[in-house]
Amino acid sequence: MLRFFPQKNKYVEEASQYAFDKEGQIPQHIAIIMDGNGRWAQNRRLPRIAGHKEGMDTVKKITKHASHLGVKVLTLYAFSTENWKRPTDEVNFLMQLPVDFFDTFVPELIKENVKVNVMGYQEFLPSHTQDAVKRAIEQTKDNTGMVLNFALNYGARAELLTAMKQIAAEVSEKAYTADEITEETIADHLMTGFLPTELRDPELLIRTSGEERISNFLLWQIAYSELFFTKALWPDFSGDTLETAIASFQNRNRRFGGLKETTETEGSDPQ
């Protein structure tokens, strides 16, 4: 029988050379660039908004899975400052998504003890989106578990520019001198500044859909993050894919510019 709307097979992550160790080190802060909703829909000859809706369901699944694994902060790149360039109908749908997401998922977040935060330029969001964000933050403010941190109308260059302007104003007001500015000063003024110092920078950054670029996301904070790229489109991203990424992280030697813990041999890479 002819199929006019063929369904592409669900993406299956290639077998990892590493096994996930649930007793091993779990990244305290994981950031994800959720990419591929539109392509997922197009592969199925569906409108792009169908991919965004499916992607919202993936957010729910991954949020709970990450929380159960012991992740402390999950930062999700939901809408960039550049995404306003997309077709109006798609942008309008994306602005409604947080409303639908929080209205249906906040009760589960409360049950899971997950706390919601949203970083970005919220003042430019439609009023109904702002209201949904405020409600979710208020309803989960007393939760003490994982922080679900959405980057909504966020761009790292704009974030850095805003921080520099705030610091310049404080120097002008003689709160401190230019010579007293430190990396911590800058970090305090970034949108992740609400987090404890040890949780501000993601240990692991994941990007879906096979693209291998950062797309103006957390440029300051990911200086020493481990990067993991998967071909899985975001709606196909699963708990198993998350564990594959963490397994890769668990088998990396994070040196932060220093030497490996094992004895270095002459002629080895000094980087």
UniProtKB/Swiss-Prot annotation:
What are the positions of the active site?
Answer: D35, N83
One Pfam family here: Prenyltransf
Enumerate the residues binding Mg(2+). Answer: D35, E226
Tell me the keywords, alphabetical order: Magnesium, Metal-binding, Transferase
Q: Which InterPro entries match?
A: UPP_synth-like (IPR001441), UPP_synth-like_CS (IPR018520), UPP_synth-like_sf (IPR036424)
Cofactors that this protein relies on: Mg(2+)
Instruction: Answer yes or no on keyword Membrane.
Output: no
GO CC annotations, alphabetized:
cytosol
- Residues the entry annotates as binding substrate: 36-40, 48, 52, 80-82, 84, 86, 207, 213-215
Annotated membrane-spanning segments are none
Q: Does the keyword Nucleotide-binding apply?
A: no
Which residues pair up as cystines? none
Cofactor binding note from Swiss-Prot or TrEMBL? Binds 2 magnesium ions per subunit.
Function, as annotated: Catalyzes the condensation of isopentenyl diphosphate (IPP) with allylic pyrophosphates generating different type of terpenoids.
Q: How does it assemble?
A: Homodimer.
Q: Which family does it belong to?
A: Belongs to the UPP synthase family.
Q: Which NCBIfam families match?
A: PRK14830.1 (NF011405), uppS (TIGR00055)
HAMAP family reported for this sequence: ISPT
Q: What is this protein called?
A: Isoprenyl transferase
Organism this protein belongs to: Enterococcus faecalis (strain ATCC 700802 / V583)
